[in-house]
Amino acid sequence: MKQLMQTDILKTSGDETRKEKTGMTKQTGRLTLPTDADIVEETIRLKNLLGADALRDCDGTEMPDALLNEPVKKYATYYTTRKDNAWAEQNPEEIQQEYLISNRVTARSEKLCIRLMEGFHTQQLKVNTLDDPKRWWEVIDRTTGEVVSVDDWEFKKEREEVEIKTIPYHEYTVSFLAFLIWDPVHMYNFITNDWKDTPHQLTYDVRQPKTQKYVKEKLKRWCEENPQIDVVRFTTFFHQFTLTFDDKKREKFVEWFGYSASVSPYILEKFEKWAGYKFRPEFIVDQGYHNSMFRVPSREFKDFIEFQQQEVCALAKELVDIVHSYGKEAMMFLGDHWIGTEPYGKYFAEIGLDAVVGSVGSGVTLRMISDIKGVKYTEGRLLPYFFPDVFGEGGDPIGEAKDNWMKARRAILRSPLDRIGYGGYLKLASEWPGFIEEIQSVVGEFRQIHENMNGTKSYVAPFKVAVLNCWGGLRKWMSNQVHHAIWHRETYSAEGVLECLSGMPFDVEFISFDDVKKGIPKDIRVIINVGDAYTSFSGAENWIDEAVVTTLRQFVDEGGGFIGVGEPTAYQHQGRFFQLADVLGVDREMGFSLSTDKYNEKNPQHFILEDIEGDIDFGEGTTRIYAQGDHYQILAMDGEYSQLVVNQYGKGHGVYFAGLPYSPQNCRILLRAIYYAAGMEQEMKRYYVTNVDTEVTVFQKMQKIAVINNSGKECQTDLYINGDFIVRLTLEPGEMRWLNETM
């Protein structure tokens, strides 16, 4: 049996005495700090204090000449699509474009005029009057879904209206192209920081030949003129995710994964040749949903993503090659103009990037970065961003930093970033009492993790867990979220599943329904399906595909596990709403079976709920769930309906959750549910801690164990190894305790 050397226990947290004992303040490296022209001396002081080995500029800040000789790496934020209004103004036809859809308007006679820009901000968007509307626009009767003939509508340029021959009391929309005359990210930063005198930055289309040639030559000149810059931080490449403002400068539509602003007649003509069929605006505007990630992607939209990946990655490689030719590193920011790069797609590695950096808002968004292959290193920009909205009246930057690190840390222990950093106005962070001390603690713990793991991987269970949705591996760690870790009432009960998984001892795969039909790999023991009915994450019409349901039934029947959260396998068909109701042991009452009596009774005595005290948080939950079949057990109920149910199905198990928002307790419940579903309960205590607020990570090759307290209170927890009690630990709030494991 493995034992612990109690004399080798090492504690790390924010306490100054503890930092002195562990030597954290003496460590350097793995940290990037922002700077600006008016904070040179303070930058040097903080660089030395925090042990930073890289400095960077940001949008709205400058790298001071006085810091160019500092013995650290210098990052320069580089924009391929903006910060050159002169070029954009000289070439208005090559300004970036976006597909918009007008308001839905009801005709009350046989003629209707639709104002195109109603509800849009005219400082951001301008109707494209240069290209033929009859070729690139589309008018649709939304009552019937039919496309209105181009002979039955006219564009009135002077009024920016479309006049349509209509059927009374039918609804109509116009899909049209507009120029992005104010870069969306610059507009966001302008509004957020209340900039007054900064010119609006136009955004130009690097995909088009004239601009492409200009941008390449400009990059070469920039590299020659900036010999002291070590890392070119592309922010990013060519197409901005969809970020559209309304006429009151409020965010109107935000889709972090959106392709609506990656279009132009030039690009679309190339797509038509590549795809072999005619392009329609509807492929992009998608009835007004703009192909939100929650939509089941159409064949045409998947084709468009494939085409864009090929084109974007090939052109990005040309820019990266230029950077490399000057002896510099090329880094990509995962955000802003990242559309088309698809880091989990099959073309990304061909770009040849040295690094990827992205914003870390949670464990999920950290894994979104740290799991990327095909680069030499990854970097996470931790929160909070040093902007006035946080570092101002009513803001709580220290609290935000603590919460951000608590979620990020558990994911780092599973899949570490190589570096961390911050962004924004360093002066704001420097002047906020206690904030720099908080960063010291975070950076110290990050370095300690790397020192103790020493490039090895943490222990994982002897089986894989797969998340099943329509996107599969293309959007690894990206599902069930609206906009990059932004909380939404409609999503947090599902997104919590991925947040829990991000720090758990499992290898997690993301698979699509096409993958299922090809056969489930033997190393996958548990499959999770989570989401609302008819979304891409639940699966919609895929659940009436005979090959899908029979393959999954066989998988569970032969010993696999299937976990459903929310409305899994949902599609009303043949007397069922949950198409795998027989596997899950539950279905949802849609009103059709109210005449059928249900006799549901709770029995919470189960392996999954051991160690669990108090009520379970199901978030928004899913209502009207009832258990059915002969082999179910209801572990939690809300009135007469079920919230947590387990079900025996052949040699395997089904588990159903009405919802699962992130919390330490829900992480523990899901952990136990996965081991139960896999039929491998005995493996759970290979390495285990009893308190639900704590988690354990083991680096077997280094004989190191980390126990973390994910709460803001002191707690006791018992450590088990190979099922045997080893030691009781008392952990301070947020503490990370390291122990040496010896034979």
Task: Go through each PLM region and give its residues.
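A glycine-rich, often tryptophan-bearing local segment used as a flexible ligand/cofactor-contacting loop or short
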Residues: 539-615
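A short helix->loop->beta-strand "cap" motif at the edges of active sites that frequently abuts
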Residues: 72, 327-328, 376, 558-561
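Extracellular ligand-binding/catalytic regions of CAZymes and related secreted enzymes
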Residues: 243-246, 427-459, 576-579, 584-592, ...
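A short, well-structured beta->alpha microelement
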Residues: 31-44, 58-62, 332-341, 499-520
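Hydrophobic targeting/anchoring helices
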Residues: 50, 86-88, 219-220, 233-237, ...
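Polysaccharide-binding and catalytic clefts of secreted carbohydrate-active enzymes
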Residues: 92-350, 368
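Catalytic domains of carbohydrate-active enzymes, especially glycoside hydrolases
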Residues: 38-73, 221-233, 407-414
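The substrate-binding groove and active-site-proximal loops of carbohydrate-active enzymes
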Residues: 29-34, 53-54, 194-213, 296-313, ...
